[in-house]
Regions:
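Iron-sulfur cluster-binding electron-transfer modules in prokaryotic oxidoreductases
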Residues: 1-211
Length: 211
C-alpha cells in the first residue's frame, strides 16, 4: 500500500518495486485498484463519512485479495491501519520492518560499504509507533550510520504534516532547514528518513543534498 504521499514521491515506489523483485516476493498493489489513501486526511478535515467509506473500500480490497501482510512506506498509513482498521489476520508492517525481515531471512543480499548515512526519525514512525531500531539496522547493513545530536524520541520535526494548517509555508521551511542543518552537521554523505513527507521536507530544507 503506497499511499498518497508515496505516490507523490515516486523514487520510494520504484525502490520498493526493486526490493520486492530482488526478494522474489509476490506482491499485489492496492493502489492499482483504487486503494490510494488510508482515509486519515479526510477524517482530519471533518469528512468522517467519506473517510469511513474509503476505509471500508480498502478493507474490502484487502479481504478480496486475501492478503496476509500489508506493507506501507507511510508512517501515517501504518498507524491508521494498525489502530483504526482492525485488520484481524493481516500483519501490518512499515517498509523498514519488512526490509529488515528480508535481510535477516537472507532474502535480500546486501554488501556493506564505507558510505556514511545519517537518519532522521519521523514523528509518526518514532514517537507515534515506537519504531526506532529497524530503520537503523537496515542502514547499518549497507553502510555507516552517523547519529544527529537530537535523535529517536528527541528528534526534530521536519515541519510537514497532512494536518499541519497551523503554521505558514515559511514556518514549515524554517523547520525543514533546521532539521537539514542538524543532519548535515553529522558529516554524513546521505540523509535518510523513513517517511515520504519527511523526505520531501528534508530535501527542500537541505537545498541540493541527497535525501
Amino acid at each position: 500500500f503506497a499511499g498518497c504521499m508515496t505516490l507523490l514521491t515516486p523514487r520510494i515506489l520504484l525502490a520498493m518495486e526493486r526490493i520486492f523483485k530482488a526478494s522474489g516476493e509476490e506482491v499485489w498493489w492496492a493502489d492499482k485498484e483504487g486503494g490510494v489513501c488510508c482515509g486519515r486526511p479526510l477524517k482530519l478535515s471533518g469528512e468522517t463519512d467519506s473517510a469511513r467509506k474509503m476505509m471500508d473500500y480498502n478493507i474490502a480490497l484487502f479481504r478480496k485479495h486475501r492478503i496476509t501482510t500489508l506493507v506501507t512506506s507511510c508512517p501515517i498509513c501504518l498507524k491508521v491501519f494498525r489502530e483504526e482498521y482492525h485488520l484481524e489476520g493481516i500483519e501490518v508492517l512499515h517498509h523498514s520492518e519488512y526490509m529488515l525481515r528480508l535481510i535477516r531471512d537472507g532474502r535480500l543480499q546486501l554488501r556493506r560499504g564505507a558510505q556514511t548515512f545519517t537518519y532522521h526519525d519521523p514523528c509518526e514512525l518514532g514517537r507515534g509507533s515506537r519504531i526506532y531500531d529497524q530503520p537503523r539496522e537496515v542502514i547499518e547493513a549497507v553502510g555507516v550510520l552517523l547519529e544527529p545530536a537530537q535523535t529517536r524520541e528527541h528528534a526534530l520535526c521536519c515541519g510537514s504534516s497532512v494536518a499541519n494548517t497551523a503554521i505558514s509555508d515559511a514556518q514549515q521551511l524554517r523547520l525543514a532547514r533546521s532539521v537539514a542543518k542538524e543532519l548535515s552537521a553529522t558529516g554524513a554523505g546521505t540523509i535518510v528518513t523513513a517517511c515520504p513527507l519527511c523526505k520531501t521536507a528534508s530535501a527542500r530544507g537541505a537545498a541540493g543534498r541527497e535525501v
